[in-house]
Each structure stands twice: as structure tokens, then as C-alpha cells.
């Protein structure tokens, strides 16, 4: 077969390519290599550069001496034209027949927290559930450091490293909200934290009841005292049923009526977690704030702010359920108030007759102080008087007044061994787990002009018996100083309450319910159905 040379084109010029390119010589279906403006000019190839691709995610490319960013495209892309047969690769596998060395038994796996150290918490007190790598003692949840028994890092103990994956606890509202209820407004905690309102010192109207001196034997160290059940009658009358409030309501200048139990909860709303509700009744120009009989405000919460609070349970035999613990804490506080006073008739201080008792000798001695606050925005204008009922529990030295409160331990009995040496750690743990409750106690004491708070620490005689308790010790706190220590801002509390008052004042006459959202940091105001 003869070799035929292709015909040469006539050159119009002796130098350079022809002005037209034949069709058979034009480039067709030739891959185009994308380029990058970051490519260095003059570098044809860098054979010493390390090949990187999208699979290399372990190294950071932004180190101290980082200069030339690597581009996954352009001239420096080493695998752009690489053709890999997916089917061939999928049928290929490598078998590793090397034997893995067994770890020697007894080698502990160290659970590290972020930063290489625990983020907080202590071993004192009840503590909280182990979260984030810190071990703390929670009743019924295994041993703790320093406690005899198996090492909590082995066996069935939980590290808590998958606590983030636990389903969130769903609570029910404290009141049954039906479809015929109308939601009026929602206020979130973030909005409440920005509120502030300055209220002048209240004016005392009158005081009712009796007071006995405080028994100072409870202040002694190493003095574990059995808490006796004296069975005193305790009155917790709501606002609208208070005969003194009813008498003061006859004055049209008095516009708002409330008790310290209810007001302290509203002022400490942003610290509350457990659900609660308050009934607001508008009658003309007057507002009455009431609690429901047998509702959440009749009982004291336990470990409300803990990371793993007591579970809600309908089992009456579960003494550590939230409901049973609340009932237990309420009884302990009532018994402590009757145990920690010296009932000497010669030392008794009497005010006006107790408005709630009919000369019952078994009534727990209390003093009820009624005060007036002006919530008007214009101090020189018409007053917006708030009538508040506060309580005082006992007398201190030199005629000072005291409030008596108790924190209770359940599930274990560590306080009696650690209270004298680890008192600070126990108090810090209680502040963490019961912040709302302690904040409310502090606000109540400030509103009632109480000079000192006596906070007792009660522990069960037996962890499985919730009827017998010992008072391990008592600490004293000055309310205003204590409020600063635990970050209780009264101006913020007054701002929250004033906002609720403004909302209720603008509505028509009737009943409204202020409800703490059980699962979100917010409160809602509802217009309930008729007949509520």
C-alpha cells in the first residue's frame, strides 16, 4: 500500500501559523484543565509537594508557618484526570490477618473531660448526677469517690458521656389547661432578665400573732438534734380569704393584694424550673393574687434546680418522688419552726390577735406583718398601693426577728459526717440544686424586714424512712447580704411583678391564670374557661 503524504497548505506568510486552521486539525473532545488564579506563575510542576485531597481531614492547613494555600483544583490538582473504576474497586478488599493484642485485665480507661479536668462539682452533699465526667453523689445512683464499694469507673456504673443523648424530661403543667382556655401573653425568661423597677421601702401597716425566742442550742457545733413531731396547726391562707386583706380592700386606694409566698415566686421566676400557677382576679381597679388550695405553692420543692431532679411518680410507695419529697420538706419546715423556739410564756411577744385562729393553743406561733408598697410610676401622682402579707418565725437577741427554714437530705446520710468539716461545700451544692427555693426564702425575709435567716440541715435517721429526721446543724445568713451572694436582684424581681400587674390591669374584670411553662423558660397568662 503506497504511502500518501498529506497535502501541505499554502502559507500566506513565511513565518507563523496559517490564518485558518483546517477542520481535521482542530482540537475536539480534548479535556480542559481548569486553572486557579492562586497558581504560581513559572512553576511547571512541584514534585516535592505533598499530595493532598479531600480525604485528608486530620491535619490543619492553618498552622503557624502557613503561607501557600493548597488548592484542590487547577494546575496543582494531582488527581483531576484520575480515572477510577468504581466497580473494580468495590469488588476489591484487604483482609487483615494480624492478631490484635489483648489489653491486660485491670487496666482502667480514664474518662477525660474537656480541658483535661472536671468542670466543677464536688463530692460534698447530695451533689448531682454524674455529667460531663464529674462524679457526684446522688441518692440511689451508685458509690462516690471516698466511699467504700466498687470503683465507679467499672461495672455497671455510668460515666454520663452519653447524657446529651438522653430524651428530654417532659413535665406536665401544674394546672389542667383545656382547649377553651385563651392564651393572652407569653413572657420569656430572657425578656424578664432585662426588666428592672425601683420600689421604695414599704410602710408597715400592722402586725398580728405571737413570737417566741429562738432556741440557740441549734447553733452549737456537733449537736445533732432529733426533730420532734409536735403536730402544730399551721395556717397558709390565700390572699382573698385573708380577713385583714378583705378589710384593707375596702379602701379604694389599695389596688393590689398578695402574700409573700406568691410574690417571692413571681420575683424569682427566672430561677424556677418546676411548674407552678397563680390565680389573678381583677375586680374593678383591684387585683388579687391567689394560690390554688393544694397547688404547687402549698409545698416546698426539693432539688428543683438539680441536673437530675427527683422524678415525677404517681407511686405512693416511692418516698423519693418529687411529690413525696415536697410533702416531706414541707412537714420538716413546719416541725423545725416549732422545735427551734423556746415556748416560755415570760419571753413571748404578742401583737394583735392571730386573724386565722380561734384561741387554739396548738397553733404554731407566727407573726403576720402587713406592709404597703407604692408601685406608681409617678411618685407624686396617684399611688398604686400594694398590700403585702409577710411572716416572721421567731425572735433573736435584742429583739431582732428571724425566719426559720430547713434544707433536707434524702437517699443518703452524709451530712452528719461531713457537715462540720465540709459545711461550705454542702451549702454550695444546696445553692446549686435548690436555687429557686433559697432565693424565695431570701426575698421573703427581705420583704418582711427580717434581720436574720436560720437555715437548718435535716437528714433522715434512715434513708428508707421519710418520717424521722435529725437536725445536723444550722447556719445564719443576713438576708440582704445573702441576696447579693446568690445573685438575687430585687429590682429585677419588682420589674417582673410590675409587668404582670400592667398586663392584668389592662384586661377586663374576671379571673386569669399565670402559668409557668413546664418545659420552656417562660410564663404564660391565660384566660380560663368559665367556672374555673
Swiss-Prot record:
Residue ranges of the region described as Disordered: 108-161
Biased amino acid composition, Low complexity: 132-141
MF-aspect GO terms: mRNA cap binding; translation initiation factor activity
Localization annotation: Cytoplasm
Stretches for region RNA gate: 296-310
Keyword Cytoplasm set for record: yes
GO BP terms in the entry: cap-dependent translational initiation; formation of cytoplasmic translation initiation complex; translational initiation
One Pfam family cited in the UniProt record for this chain: eIF-3_zeta
UniProt keyword list: Cytoplasm, Initiation factor, Protein biosynthesis, RNA-binding
CC terms in the record's Gene Ontology section: cytosol; eukaryotic 43S preinitiation complex; eukaryotic 48S preinitiation complex; eukaryotic translation initiation factor 3 complex; eukaryotic translation initiation factor 3 complex, eIF3e; eukaryotic translation initiation factor 3 complex, eIF3m
Bias type Gly residues, positions: 117-131
InterPro entries, per database record: eIF3d
Keyword field contains RNA-binding: yes
Disulfide links within the chain: none
Domain notes: The RNA gate region regulates mRNA cap recognition to prevent promiscuous mRNA-binding before assembly of eif3d into the full eukaryotic translation initiation factor 3 (eIF-3) complex.
HAMAP family: eIF3d
Self-association state and partner proteins as the record states: Component of the eukaryotic translation initiation factor 3 (eIF-3) complex.
Function text: mRNA cap-binding component of the eukaryotic translation initiation factor 3 (eIF-3) complex, which is involved in protein synthesis of a specialized repertoire of mRNAs and, together with other initiation factors, stimulates binding of mRNA and methionyl-tRNAi to the 40S ribosome. The eIF-3 complex specifically targets and initiates translation of a subset of mRNAs involved in cell proliferation. In the eIF-3 complex, eif3d specifically recognizes and binds the 7-methylguanosine cap of a subset of mRNAs.
Family, per entry: Belongs to the eIF-3 subunit D family.
Designated name of the protein: Eukaryotic translation initiation factor 3 subunit D
Organism: Yarrowia lipolytica (strain CLIB 122 / E 150) (Yeast)
Source species taxonomy: Eukaryota, Fungi, Dikarya, Ascomycota, Saccharomycotina
